[in-house]
Amino acid sequence: MKSYQDNIKKLVPEMRRVKQIHFVGIGGAGMSGIAEVLLNEGYQISGSDIVESIVTKHLADAGAKIFIGHQAENIAGASVVVVSSAIEENNPEITAAKSARIPVIQRAQMLAEIMRFRHSIAVAGTHGKTTTTAMLSMIYTEAGLDPTFVNGGLVKSAGKNAHLGASRYLIAEADESDASFLHLQPMLSVVTNIEPDHMDTYGGDFEQMKTIYVKFLRNLPFYGLAVMCADDDVVMEIAPQVGRQVISYGFNANADYRIENYQQTGFQGHYTVICPNNERLDVVLNVPGHHNALNATAALAVAKEEGIANDAILAALADFQGAGRRFDPLGTFKRPNGTVMLIDDYGHHPTEIAVTIKAARQGWQHKRIVMIFQPHRYSRTRDLFDDFVNVLSKVDVLIMLDVYAAGENAIVKADSKALCRSIRNLGKVDPILVSDTSQLGEVLDQIIQDNDLILAQGAGNISKLTRKLAEDWQA
C-alpha cells in the first residue's frame, strides 16, 4: 500500500508541470527547509547563495544542485524561482527569471503549496516560533504521527530543520517579517506574542501589524482553531477580532491552559498545566526559562486539542533538547582566571534578550552574567534603541560587537558606539566595545572570573565567532 508520501505529487496535480525548483538564497533557514522537503518529494532542486555553509553542503549531498554566487545562468532549467525576503529585486537570477517569464514567488507561497493538501499547523509570533514549532514536531513524532515539519532553526532531536513525513500532518514556522505568512491557510494557528519588529514592512505602523495578524488568523477555515497566548496583551486585544474558535494558554489566571508553580534549577524547569477540563498535567522541561514554559504550553495545548495522548506530549517535552542557538550550551571551559560556562543564544530583540537574562539569573543565581552582544540590523537598533539600552544594562559585564548590518546601510546614532554611550550614561554597566573580533578571546580572558556564565547573544555571525572561541578554548 502506498504511503501518503508516495502519493503527495498526485495530490498536487496543479504542480505537475513543475520539474525543477530554484531557490535564490537557499542557505537561509526557512528556504533550506522548504527546499529539503521538496527535494524529498522528488522535485529537482537547485539554488544559490553567496557563501557555502553546512546547510548548502547538506542539500548538495542530498541531491540539490548548489551554486555559490548569484548568476543569471544559475536558473537554467527552472520551472519556478523561489526567493527569500533578503534578496534584492535587482538580483541577476530574479532579473533573468522575469525575462524568461519564469514565475518568481516568495518562500511563503511555496510553503503554502506544501501545506495545501495537508493538515497543517502554523506557528506565528515575534518570539518563540522556532522553539514552539520544534516542540510540536517532537510531540507529533513521539505520538507516532511522523509529521512533515519546516522550521526556522535546527530541531536538535531530529538533527535538522525540516523533514518530509509520511503522514498528512505538517507543522511550520510562519514568518511575519515580510507579512508573507498571509499566503498560508493552515487548519490551526498559534500566536505566541506580538511586538514591534520588522516595522519597515508595516510602514512603521504597529496598528497595521496587528491588522495583518488578524488577517493571518482569519485565513483559518471556519472550523479551524487559533491557539493564542493569554499573557500577551496585544494577542488578547486582537483575539475578539479573529472570528474563529480561540483557545488561550499562559500564566494568566484566565488562560484555558494555565501554567502554575513554575520552578527552575539550572537547565531544568518543571510546572503544572491546568487544562480546560481541570485535568492537571505535570510538565518537565530541560530548556530553561518562563518563556520556554510558555512555548511548551502552546505546543501542549495544540496537541491536547488535536487528541494526542498525554504520555506522548509529556515524554516529548521532557526529552526536548532545544532548538538550535536557543540558550545553547557550548560547554564549560577552564581559563586562566577560572572556569566559565559558555551559552550561545539567537535572541536579538530586547524582549528575547530579557527572557534569556531572566532564565540565566533564575537557573544560575550565583553566577556573574557576562554578555557578548552583537546588534542585528541598524534599523532594529534605531527602532528599539531605548529598549536595548535598558535590557543590556541588566547584565553584570557587557561586551559589545559592531552592528551586524544584514545588508543594511549604516544609520547615524544607531550603531554600537551610540548604544555603548547611552548604556554607560545609564550608570549600571560600563560596556566594552570590541570592533576587532579577532581580539574577543583576549578581551574575555582579561575580564572573566571563576564561575562566570558567558552569554553570546545575537542573530548575526556571533555564533560562528563564539563556536570558534569554544574550539580554541577546548584545544
Swiss-Prot record:
Cellular component, GO annotation: cytoplasm
The protein's Enzyme Commission number: 6.3.2.8
Major enzyme class: ligase
Compartments (UniProt record): Cytoplasm
Keywords: ATP-binding, Cell cycle, Cell division, Cell shape, Cell wall biogenesis/degradation, Cytoplasm, Ligase, Nucleotide-binding, Peptidoglycan synthesis
Pfam families according to UniProt: Mur_ligase, Mur_ligase_C, Mur_ligase_M
InterPro entries: Mur-like_cat_sf, Mur_ligase_C, Mur_ligase_C_dom_sf, Mur_ligase_cen, Mur_ligase_N, MurCDEF_pg_biosynth, UDP-N-AcMur_Ala_ligase_MurC
Reaction catalysis annotation: UDP-N-acetyl-alpha-D-muramate + L-alanine + ATP = UDP-N-acetyl-alpha-D-muramoyl-L-alanine + ADP + phosphate + H(+)
A Gene Ontology BP annotation from the UniProt entry: peptidoglycan biosynthetic process
Translocase in keyword set: no
Domain of life where this protein originates: Bacteria
Binding of ATP, residues: G125, T126, H127, G128, K129, T130, T131
Hydrolase found in the keyword field: no
GO molecular-function terms, A-Z: ATP binding; UDP-N-acetylmuramate-L-alanine ligase activity
Pathway(s) this gene product operates in, as recorded in its UniProt entry: Cell wall biogenesis; peptidoglycan biosynthesis
Protein family according to the UniProt entry: Belongs to the MurCDEF family.
Function per UniProt: Cell wall formation.
HAMAP family reported in the protein's UniProt record: MurC
Name the UniProt record assigns to this protein: UDP-N-acetylmuramate--L-alanine ligase
Organism: Haemophilus ducreyi (strain 35000HP / ATCC 700724)
Gene encoding the protein: murC
